[in-house]
From Swiss-Prot:
The keyword RNA-binding applies. RNaseP catalyzes the removal of the 5'-leader sequence from pre-tRNA to produce the mature 5'-terminus. It can also cleave other RNA substrates such as 4.5S RNA. The protein component plays an auxiliary but essential role in vivo by binding to the 5'-leader sequence and broadening the substrate specificity of the ribozyme. Keywords: Endonuclease, Hydrolase, Nuclease, RNA-binding, tRNA processing. The keyword NAD does not apply. Consists of a catalytic RNA component (M1 or rnpB) and a protein subunit. PANTHER family: RIBONUCLEASE P PROTEIN COMPONENT. It comes from Micrococcus luteus (strain ATCC 4698 / DSM 20030 / JCM 1464 / CCM 169 / CCUG 5858 / IAM 1056 / NBRC 3333 / NCIMB 9278 / NCTC 2665 / VKM Ac-2230) (Micrococcus lysodeikticus). Belongs to the RnpA family. One of its GO terms (cellular component) is ribonuclease P complex. It catalyses: Endonucleolytic cleavage of RNA, removing 5'-extranucleotides from tRNA precursor. This is Ribonuclease P protein component. One of its GO terms (biological process) is tRNA 5'-leader removal.
Length: 132
């Protein structure tokens, strides 16, 4: 489970992701990534932290199916948030499950979510020349 401070919670944050986010899709998920305006304006000394939100509509299936998909997606994203480069970026991440996610096993959901997340994160990564 993601701690409360690591989740996208407000409708305004989800709207921000929808309007300004970089999207990457696969058969089972669409991942959107946007810079977190709260953390870029903040003057707090704490390290930047990514935050994630999940959208699983009724098109995915009944409540049991939607909750299973959401639990699996949360587990995948929580794992990725502990690893670089996502760990160190002040971004908002939205993972939207598509109807095909209902039939996908954990391995497929993980593979597609990680792939889409990597593609959506590319514009938010620091340029390689900055480190040289």
């Amino acid at each position: 489970m993601l701690p409360r401070d690591r989740r996208v919670r407000t409708p305004a944050e989800f709207r921000h992701l929808g309007r300004t986010g970089t999207r990457a899709g696969r058969r089972t998920v669409v991942v959107s990534v946007a810079t977190d305006p709260d953390q870029t304006r903040s003057t707090s000394p704490s390290a930047p932290r990514p935050r994630a939100g999940f959208v699983v509509s009724k098109a995915v299936g009944n409540a049991v199916t939607r909750n299973r998909v959401k639990r699996r997606l949360r587990a995948v994203v929580a794992e990725q948030m502990r690893l670089p480069p996502l760990r160190d970026l002040p971004v908002l991440v939205q993972v939207r499950a598509l109807p095909a996610a209902a039939e996908a096993d954990y391995a497929l959901l993980r593979r597609e979510t990680v792939g889409a997340l990597g593609k959506a994160l590319k514009p938010h990564l620091p340029a390689a020349s900055e480190h040289a």
